[in-house]
Amino acid sequence: MRQLIAGNWKMNGLRSTSESLLQALRDAAPHALRNCDMLICPPATLIAQAASVLAGSGIEVGAQDCHMARSGAHTGDLSAEMLVEAGAHWVILGHSERRRDHGELSETVREKVIAARQFGLTPIVCVGETEDERASGRETEIVGWQIKGSLPDGFAADSNGVIAYEPVWAIGTGRTATVEDVAMMHAFIREELVRQFGEAGRGVRILYGGSVKPENAASLLRVPEVGGALVGGASLSAQDFLAIAEASA
């Protein structure tokens, strides 16, 4: 299975400043997509622009969250249907920053996954432990709970779901998990997916996310069971994001 290099722009980018980045990605797509799949998840305000610029390039566009309801009194939220209409085909769900900043529980993430798939969005479900949880030796316990709570029945049935392992202590800190840490956690996640979904669990891509950059991408992407990368800050630079994609070769 081809690796997936996904860029999470987080709360960064304006229409006026994103055009050149999107154009650079579009221009590089024929070369960049030789060995991997690529995806960017800009802020919701930029989804339509990104979808327009990248149309036909092979680089896909996603969102950073969606609400579980189709419509209603949910001020500030966006439904999966709205995101699809804007041009999204993917959605990040359960990112540690949403779990932290918005108090999202795994049960909420599960409902969002169900809603996303109803409208054709492919979910990237994030799991990962904090520094305190790792220090106390509970990293597999925490991630196991998150997998069980966040993934609905049938998540792996059509190999259309993606997991992103993001050690919370490595996100935006410049710290990166060691290759040994990544190998251990990705092997554990694969075991949990097979335990929960049977052989279908072997078809789920497991991305690594946590300060991925050109300097460490090759070593991380060579780790067994690493099916790609969820890239944060480095995805805001076309040069860096494309270098990470090149490392997947």
From Swiss-Prot:
Entry-linked Gene3D superfamilies: Aldolase class I (3.20.20.70)
Keywords, sorted A to Z: Cytoplasm, Gluconeogenesis, Glycolysis, Isomerase
A single Gene Ontology CC term: cytosol
Residues holding substrate: N8, W9, K10, G172, S211, G232, G233
Superkingdom assignment: Bacteria
Reaction(s) catalysed (UniProt annotation): D-glyceraldehyde 3-phosphate = dihydroxyacetone phosphate
Single GO BP term: glycerol catabolic process
Family matches, as InterPro entries: Aldolase_TIM (IPR013785), TIM_sf (IPR035990), TrioseP_Isoase_bac/euk (IPR022896), Triosephosphate_isomerase (IPR000652), Triosephosphate_isomerase_AS (IPR020861)
Keyword Isomerase attached: yes
SUPFAM superfamilies assigned to the protein according to its UniProt record, in alphabetical order: Triosephosphate isomerase (TIM)
Pathway(s) of this molecule: Carbohydrate biosynthesis; gluconeogenesis; Carbohydrate degradation; glycolysis; D-glyceraldehyde 3-phosphate from glycerone phosphate: step 1/1
Subcellular location: Cytoplasm
Catalytic residues of the enzyme: H95, E166
Gene Ontology molecular functions: triose-phosphate isomerase activity
Enzyme category, top tier: isomerase
UniProt-listed Pfam families: TIM
Assembly with partners or alone: Homodimer.
HAMAP family: TIM_B
Functional description taken from the UniProt entry: Involved in the gluconeogenesis. Catalyzes stereospecifically the conversion of dihydroxyacetone phosphate (DHAP) to D-glyceraldehyde-3-phosphate (G3P).
Annotated family: Belongs to the triosephosphate isomerase family.
Protein name, entry field: Triosephosphate isomerase
Highest classification ranks of the organism: Bacteria, Pseudomonadati, Pseudomonadota, Alphaproteobacteria, Acetobacterales
